[in-house]
């Protein structure tokens, strides 16, 4: 352990969900009461990564995270670097950062955004055989980035994400 590691603050621990996207995880981590970090940049500053965490929250991964970046983040969030790597797109997979996609049926079971939904070729939830949503089923507002899913609902009409499953179409 070097000198920088000894003075670097450790954040309150937030357990990652299975299949969770890095954007959703970083948003939950920042909002966790023990952390209360106002921005992605503030998290990046603590981890010694600067603005790169802001790109990750917006689902921009070009260039793909390096092992050193993952290890730097792992030091402050107490999550193994290999586990963090699972929250990013697999090497060779093309990700489409917009529109943000959601399977409301999955979200009702586990309230998190899954990285697999953002894969370019992914149009349906394999688990539920439902078409992925790209906007609110009530007001048609596009979904914000997963890091900003604070209330688990549409920020415009307040329909809970989980309730959108009723209007999600079979694929």
Range-by-range predicted roles:
Residues 1-99, 104, 111:
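A structured, charge-rich N-terminal accessory region that forms the first stable segment of a protein
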Residues 134-171:
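Domain-exit/linker segments immediately C-terminal to small folded modules
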Residues 93, 123-127, 145, 156-159:
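Solvent-exposed, non-transmembrane amphipathic alpha-helical segments
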Residues 96-102, 118-121, 129-133, 150-153:
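Short metal-coordination and nucleic-acid-contact micro-motifs, chiefly zinc-binding Cys/His arrays
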Residues 107-110, 129, 143, 147:
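Short, flexible loop/turn elements at secondary-structure junctions
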Residues 49-53, 126, 148-149:
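Short amphipathic alpha-helical patches
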Residues 90-93, 109-116, 120-126:
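Catalytic micro-motifs at enzyme active sites that drive phosphoryl/nucleotidyl and oxygen chemistry
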Residues 104-108, 124-127, 138, 156:
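Short, cysteine/histidine-rich loop/knuckle motifs that typically chelate Zn2+
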């Amino acid at each position: 352990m070097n000198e920088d590691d000894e003075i670097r603050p450790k954040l309150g621990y937030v357990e990652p969900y299975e299949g969770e996207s890095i954007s959703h995880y970083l948003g939950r981590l920042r909002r966790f009461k023990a952390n209360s970090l106002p921005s992605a940049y503030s998290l990046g500053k603590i981890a010694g990564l600067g603005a790169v965490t802001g790109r990750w929250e917006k689902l921009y991964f070009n260039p793909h995270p390096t092992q050193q970046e993952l290890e730097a983040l792992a030091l402050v969030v107490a999550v193994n670097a290999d586990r963090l790597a699972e929250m990013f797109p697999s090497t060779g997979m093309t990700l489409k950062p917009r529109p943000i996609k959601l399977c409301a049926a999955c979200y009702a079971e586990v309230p998190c955004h899954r990285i697999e939904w953002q894969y370019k070729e992914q149009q349906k939830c394999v688990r539920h055989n439902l078409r992925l949503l790209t906007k609110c089923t009530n007001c048609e507002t596009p979904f914000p980035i997963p890091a900003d899913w604070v209330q688990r609902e549409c920020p415009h009409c307040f329909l809970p994400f989980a309730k959108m499953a009723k209007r999600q179409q079979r694929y």
